[in-house]
């Protein structure tokens, strides 16, 4: 017996090893090192010598070649020669390293005799007395049996490879030598148990034994081999051979082929019969010491299904020391032989279910109803069924218990999929979940890992074992000593990243400091460029877009990275496919450098769904990954099971099934039919008792009208499976979705549809996605309803997110809330009126004292738990401000009926045309905090573009500051521009378009029919224009009208204080012209003018060096604009086009400079376009505030200045 090191495996009949330890076959390792050094010195010095190159090349020739991979000269055998245009290419086998490599003819040298004295270092081995078998299926006879084969099955080879890979020590006992091949009994030590590999292959039906005597049982094609110990072989046998007494007596080869391994008999016997037979032949005490072997039987694409990991398996793969060896001449009858064969079959009755679980145990588990959920594995994994046996550090095991006992709702939600409800109630941790028991061990060993499960969004599937690896600092010592993370966790959104970051903070108390960093980088280049990681940061939690932006400026970020974790991998590839593969390419490039060979490199992907991108991830970026799938419908996608669906009526289901089976080939094959009831089962059995299924795995689904509730889910599954979907299913599903949408008529409008104009998945969203005229009528604040258009003043009190606020509309004339508030304060001044509510009802209206104010509140929820003083917590909503608050019961005051009459004054406001960047659907808290600090409690001016129910859509929303000394006002900021300036939001031009569609579908007035189409009150723009003109020209102009005047203006009427005249937009005689309203903004080299008229006919535009004349007809109205420009333009490069049904003029500047205004003379119909304000502020991460002291010419906050009132407003006339 000697120890060996396996170099290369082709199959159990051909593998190369290095002999270790003391043996008369072994040369000293130092001799090979000296040989290697001498060969390199010699051939490097003689590399240009023509005499050293062989004159001709032949297959089987011994030579010396240069190996690019090993960077040295090696002894080799030429296996084949291929000719090409400029040289010959030889496939060579390196005899000392057991490698096949292609070598150019110029790198082949003659083998010097002195270098060929030492034997080849790689020895060729094969298993002694062991031959391959295969499963032969006779479709005509409808049976299957295991028969001898001429070559090893791929499943046997892969099992053999996995078995040796899992060993800690491999030993061999030499039995024979045939030419250059050593025939051995191979022993592998697995978990301190020694297993005879020869026996194990036979016991698992991967091989059969042949007689060691002469040539009697040899295949006629095989050559006889020389026995090293022919005398002892006749009397001493391997302990495993005691189970095969008749086969070792030289029985006829063909008889063994037909009867020795009768597969059908062994499978048709019941477990009880098999148990009785094996008890008659051999007592079970001989197998009590058997241990579970590392079993792996791959089926399609390497899938193995393990039905019950809880049942300890019994295997015949270990040695049986208590059994006595049998002589070759000893004769047994046929019953004893069959009993021994069936004993092996009982120990592992079905090689297609190679988990070692007996049918008897399976039946017992089914009867008890405790069958564990299935799991599909790519490699054999030993699950950790308890926390004590899990591969976690002791501190983390304690932390798992502590986290579970936490009362925080977030932790309970995170554990929801992992811990059974009864365990949560008992506050006891039962151990890792079913999925975690398979995912933790490979991750803790540093293996590449893919986990697909229904609970695949749970970070606890990978976080504890990952933290365990990060505690072992020794494996990272070879990495460069610079700042950079060891692990990066990529999440599909900032919200999940925030949760994992907080979870890391909790777990870091039980580990060495990892200094995790939450990385969310916006669109601004400077933010990524100036980002600096703190020293000692070992873990980064981020999103794909943020990480890629950082990599753009920090190319060495992955220099120390060893662990890349992809959380919710299916969502990552769905929402950021290009970014993910860019990150993976960068990671692969960094970990494959030679300096990183000794450091770990691991990719862990955890998700809910399998898709083609994950398949590409496994093939291109992972090395021998472990794949765990506990969602069996996802395993079908992984296994490429063909999905077919047929739609039919319930009454036609049986006939449709028979039609499907008619397309089955004439030779009967296996079909498994699932039915909904016993009656259907009997009908199907009578209708087609002998029909069988397709040879290729196929799933055929019959969908009837009774399965309408499953139609949407089935369609989504078939889409992910890339199946051929009949058009009828799309129509059927559309009808189902429409019916579901009708049922949601009383549900609130989808918040995402309101905020952004779209919902990510209407099929699963519980809210409504259409306008209900009954529910969405603008509600009344008093005797007036909410405004559906026009300009308003608002004060936001509660900031839900960056674009969603709750507040009040301020009416300058009659503020009913102020009156109510004054009356409530006066009432509650009397201490006798402050009566606490004894009985609290849900949705009841009460009073609440806050500092010096009294608020009306509505009870939303009353807590069932009471504190020590008997005061339970109550969740209330302040109906006049929109915010919610948690208070105690004694804070509620009885509210008189007279204070109930005024409807709630809180209104919901949504800022339009902006949405989160990076395909997010939730605003980053950084933006929400900034906007909250900016706008809460302040008066703002806004334009209403839509009103539904209690919600107003506003665009724009600005903060205005009055300059009383100058009798004018300026705009401090535009809320939408502020959001965009943070770099966390992008333009959402489709927002209003989607709202228009909703309006049309609900048959409500179209947007164009709404009376108000003006922008911010002209007086506000005029005051800003005046400020810009004063800044640019240094002159003094008259102030525009006050802001109060603008509140009174009606749609289509713009009031000016110049001469106190009011100019109407009523239709005028044909002989007169109208001046169109114009919005403008500028870039470095051009100025853009938007003419705010639609349905234009016969438009003309003439360009001069300092002037533009535009004219057009709209219906029976003639519009004319003669604009004298502030600066010069290149008239040949200017153009006028129709875009979005409106004229758009582009003026090319003569010089690339910033204009402080558009016109030399002020025109009230020409205003700066504040919607493009942010485009002038790209260079700054924050928007510039317009004020009276510092007005930038670049931002030009800047409508136009005017010296006279000769020009008129939109619709005004000129002679």
UniProtKB/Swiss-Prot annotation:
Restricted to the gonads. Its EC number is 3.6.4.13. A motif (DEAH box) lies at residues 567-570. Residues 440-628 form the Helicase ATP-binding domain. Residues 56-118, 809-909 form the Tudor domain. Residues 308-327, 1027-1071 are annotated as: Disordered. It comes from the Eukaryota. ATP binds at residues 453-460. Disruption phenotype: Mice are viable but show male sterility with chromosome synapsis failure. Male mice display atrophied testes, with seminiferous tubules that are narrow with large vacuolated spaces, devoid of late-stage germ cells. Retrotransposons are derepressed due to DNA demethylation. Component of a mRNP complex containing PIWIL2, TDRD1 and piRNAs. Component of the PET complex, at least composed of EXD1, PIWIL2, TDRD12 and piRNAs. Probable ATP-binding RNA helicase required during spermatogenesis to repress transposable elements and preventing their mobilization, which is essential for the germline integrity. Acts via the piRNA metabolic process, which mediates the repression of transposable elements during meiosis by forming complexes composed of piRNAs and Piwi proteins and governs the methylation and subsequent repression of transposons. Involved in the secondary piRNAs metabolic process. This is Putative ATP-dependent RNA helicase TDRD12.
């Amino acid at each position: 017996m000697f120890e060996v090191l396996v170099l290369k495996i082709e199959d159990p009949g051909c593998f190369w090893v290095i002999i270790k330890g003391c043996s008369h076959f072994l040369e000293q390792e130092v001799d090979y090192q000296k040989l290697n050094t001498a060969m390199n010195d010699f051939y490097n010095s003689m590399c240009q010598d023509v005499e050293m190159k062989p004159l001709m090349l032949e297959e089987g020739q011994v030579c010396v070649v240069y190996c690019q991979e090993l960077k040295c000269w090696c002894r080799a055998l030429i296996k084949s020669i291929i000719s090409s245009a400029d040289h010959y290419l030889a496939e060579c086998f390196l005899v000392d390293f057991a490698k096949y490599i292609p070598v150019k003819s110029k790198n082949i040298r003659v083998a010097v005799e002195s270098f060929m004295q030492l034997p080849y270092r790689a020895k060729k081995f094969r298993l002694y007395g062991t031959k391959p078998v295969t499963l032969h299926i006779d479709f005509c006879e409808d049976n299957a049996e295991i028969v001898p084969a001429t070559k090893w099955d791929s499943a046997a080879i892969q099992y053999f490879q996995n078995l040796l890979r899992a060993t800690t020590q491999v030993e061999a006992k030499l039995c024979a030598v045939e030419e250059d091949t050593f025939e051995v009994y191979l022993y592998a030590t697995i978990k301190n148990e020694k297993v005879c590999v020869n026996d194990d292959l036979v016991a698992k039906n991967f091989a059969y034994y042949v007689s060691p005597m002469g040539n009697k049982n040899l295949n006629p094609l095989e050559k006889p081999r020389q026995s090293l110990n022919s005398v002892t072989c006749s009397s001493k046998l391997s302990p495993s051979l005691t189970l095969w007494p008749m086969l070792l007596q030289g029985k006829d080869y063909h008889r063994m082929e037909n009867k020795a391994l009768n597969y059908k008999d062994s499978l048709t016997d019941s477990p009880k019969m098999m148990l009785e037979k094996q008890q008659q032949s051999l007592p079970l005490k001989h197998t009590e010491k058997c241990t579970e072997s590392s079993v792996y039987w791959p089926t399609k694409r390497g899938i193995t299904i393990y039905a019950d990991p809880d049942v300890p398996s019994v295997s015949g793969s270990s040695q049986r020391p208590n059994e006595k060896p049998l002589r070759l001449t000893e004769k047994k009858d046929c019953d004893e032989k069959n009993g021994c064969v069936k004993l092996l079959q009982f120990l592992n009755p079905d090689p297609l279910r190679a988990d070692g679980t007996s049918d008897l145990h399976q039946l017992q588990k089914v009867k008890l109803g405790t069958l564990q959920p299935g799991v599909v594995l790519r490699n054999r994994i030993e699950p950790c069924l308890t926390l004590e046996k899990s591969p976690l550090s002791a501190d983390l095991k304690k932390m798992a218990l502590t986290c579970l006992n936490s009362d925080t709702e977030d932790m309970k939600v995170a554990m929801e999929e992992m811990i059974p409800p009864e365990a949560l109630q008992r506050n006891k941790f039962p151990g890792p979940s079913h999925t975690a028991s398979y995912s933790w061990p490979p991750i803790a060993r540093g293996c590449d890992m893919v986990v697909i499960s229904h609970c695949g969004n749970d970070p606890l599937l990978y976080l504890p074992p990952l933290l365990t690896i990060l505690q072992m600092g020794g494996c990272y010592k070879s990495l460069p000593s610079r700042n950079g993370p060891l692990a990066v966790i990529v999440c599909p959104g900032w919200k999940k990243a925030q949760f994992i970051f907080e979870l890391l903070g909790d777990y870091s108390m039980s580990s060495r400091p990892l200094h995790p960093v939450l990385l969310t980088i916006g669109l601004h280049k400077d933010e990524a460029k100036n980002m600096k990681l703190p020293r000692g940061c070992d873990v980064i939690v981020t999103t794909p877009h943020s990480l890629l932006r950082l990599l753009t400026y920090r190319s060495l970020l992955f220099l120390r990275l060893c662990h890349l974790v992809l959380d919710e991998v299916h969502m990552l590839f769905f929402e950021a496919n290009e970014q993910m593969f860019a990150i993976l390419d960068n990671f692969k490039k960094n970990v494959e450098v030679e300096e990183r060979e000794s450091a770990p490199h691991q990719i862990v992907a955890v998700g809910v769904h399998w898709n083609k991108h994950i398949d590409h991830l496994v093939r291109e970026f992972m090395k021998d990954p472990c794949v765990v799938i506990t969602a069996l419908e996802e395993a079908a996608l992984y296994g490429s099971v063909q999905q077919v669906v047929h739609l039919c009526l319930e009454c036609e289901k049986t006939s449709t099934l028979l039609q499907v089976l008619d397309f089955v080939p004439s030779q009967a094959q296996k079909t498994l039919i699932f039915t909904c009831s016993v009656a259907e089962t009997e009908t199907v059995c009578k209708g087609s008792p002998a029909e069988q299924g397709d040879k290729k795995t196929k799933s055929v689904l019959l969908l009837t009208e009774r399965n309408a509730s499953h139609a949407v889910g089935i369609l989504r599954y078939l889409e992910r499976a890339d199946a051929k979907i009949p058009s009828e299913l799309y129509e059927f599903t559309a009808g189902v979705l429409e019916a579901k949408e009708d049922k949601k008529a009383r549900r609130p409008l989808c918040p995402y549809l309101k905020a952004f104009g779209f919902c990510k998945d209407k099929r699963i969203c519980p809210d409504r996605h259409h306008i209900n005229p009954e529910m969405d009528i603008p509600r009344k604040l008093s005797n007036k309803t909410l405004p559906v258009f026009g300009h308003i003043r608002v004060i936001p009190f509660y900031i839900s997110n960056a674009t969603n606020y709750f507040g009040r509309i301020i009416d300058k004339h009659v503020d009913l809330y102020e009156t109510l508030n004054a009356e409530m304060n006066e009432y509650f001044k009397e201490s006798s009126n402050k009566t606490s509510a004894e009985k609290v009802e849900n949705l009841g209206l009460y009073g609440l004292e806050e500092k010096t104010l009294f608020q009306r509140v509505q009870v939303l929820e009353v807590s069932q738990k009471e504190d020590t003083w008997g005061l339970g917590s109550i969740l209330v909503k302040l109906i006049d401000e929109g915010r919610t608050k948690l208070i105690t019961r004694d804070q509620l005051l009885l509210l008189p009926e007279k204070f109930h009459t005024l409807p709630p004054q809180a209104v919901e406001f949504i800022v339009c045309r902006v949405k989160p960047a990076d395909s997010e659907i939730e605003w980053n808290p950084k933006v929400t905090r900034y906007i909250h600090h900016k706008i809460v409690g302040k008066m703002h001016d806004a334009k209403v573009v839509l009103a539904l129910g209690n919600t107003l859509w506003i665009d724009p929303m600005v903060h205005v500051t009055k300059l009383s000394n100058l009798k004018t006002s300026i705009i401090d900021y535009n809320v939408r521009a502020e959001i965009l300036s943070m770099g966390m939001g992008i333009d959402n031009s489709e927002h209003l378009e989607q709202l228009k569609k909703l309006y049309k579908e609900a048959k409500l007035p179209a947007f164009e029919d709404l009376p108000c189409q003006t922008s911010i009150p002209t007086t506000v723009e005029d005051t800003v224009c005046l400020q810009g003109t004063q800044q640019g020209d240094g002159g003094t102009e008259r102030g525009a009208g006050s802001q109060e005047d603008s509140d009174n203006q009606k749609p289509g009427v713009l009031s000016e204080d110049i001469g106190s005249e009011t100019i109407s937009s009523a239709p005028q005689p044909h002989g007169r012209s109208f001046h169109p309203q114009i919005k403008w903004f500028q870039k470095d080299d051009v100025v853009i003018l938007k003419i705010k008229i639609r349905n234009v006919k016969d438009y003309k535009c003439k360009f001069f060096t300092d002037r533009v004349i535009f004219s057009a007809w709209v219906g029976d109205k003639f519009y004319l604009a003669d604009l004298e420009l502030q600066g010069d333009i290149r008239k040949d490069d200017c153009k006028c086009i129709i875009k979005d049904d409106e004229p758009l003029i582009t003026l090319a500047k003569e010089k690339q400079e910033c204009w402080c205004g558009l016109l030399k003379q002020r025109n009230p119909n020409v205003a700066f376009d504040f919607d493009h304000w942010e485009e002038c502020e790209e260079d700054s991460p924050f928007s510039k505030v317009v004020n009276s002291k510092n007005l930038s010419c670049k931002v030009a906050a800047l409508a136009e200045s005017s010296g006279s009132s000769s020009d008129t407003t939109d619709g005004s006339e000129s002679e």
